[in-house]
A protein has these predicted regions:
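Bacterial Sec-dependent N-terminal signal peptides
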Residues: 1-37
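Short amphipathic alpha-helical surface micro-motifs
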Residues: 26-32, 43-44, 66-68, 122-124
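Low-complexity, acidic Ser/Thr/Pro/Gly-rich terminal tails and inter-domain linkers that flank the onset
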Residues: 36-55
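Extended surface/linker regions that mediate inter-domain or inter-protein docking
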Residues: 56-179
Length: 179
């Protein structure tokens, strides 16, 4: 026996059960309105390079999409928010599991920068190509660097250091985006 007294769902600390059948269904929650500044506010960025090609003058052209941690498209990315890199994987005489990444985009670091006492080629990034917002969190970027027409001073410095900056389409290449 329960001891009487009814109690039901009116006793202190007792939560009511589900509504009886046939009651109205509560409305769906209203999703939050996407932010006007999703890039600045995103705590997680999901970036996917969806295409990478060379145009007729051997400039890399990439397409990519960007979303936040909730898979909401980042629609306000600007060229000031990103930098781009392109490099090739050069083989090594030590075997097929070794090699070095050689950047096509370089500057010459003068003596005294870092531990060096002579000018040194230093890989860098660019952002002076053509950046296009395609809408819906999709973007494209055409590098200003042509892989087959690098600046003469960079090629001369590379030669002095024993580096090969020639474009070999048979090698593995990598494009990267820095946010």
């Amino acid at each position: 026996a329960c001891g009487g007294g009814g109690g039901g769902d009116s006793a202190p600390g007792v939560q009511p059960g589900p509504p009886p059948p046939g009651q109205p269904i509560p409305p769906e929650p209203i999703p939050p309105v996407p932010s006007a500044n999703p890039y600045v506010e995103a705590q997680v960025l999901n970036a996917f390079i969806t295409a990478a090609t060379l145009n007729d003058i051997n400039q890399p052209v990439i397409e990519f999409q960007l979303s936040d941690g909730n898979n909401i498209a980042i629609t306000d990315l600007t060229l000031d928010d990103v930098r781009f890199v392109v490099s090739k994987l050069e083989s090594s005489p030590l075997g097929n599991l070794t090699g070095t990444w050689q950047s096509y985009i370089n500057v010459i670091a003068p003596p005294g920068v870092g531990p060096g006492t002579v000018p040194e080629l230093q890989g860098t990034s660019e952002r002076d190509g053509t950046f296009t917002n395609l809408g819906g969190g999709k973007y494209s970027y055409r590098y200003s660097t042509s892989l087959t027409d690098l600046p003469a001073d960079i090629l001369q410095q590379a030669k002095a250091q024993g580096l090969d900056l020639s474009c070999d389409p048979n090698l593995t290449h990598r494009v990267a985006i820095q946010f």
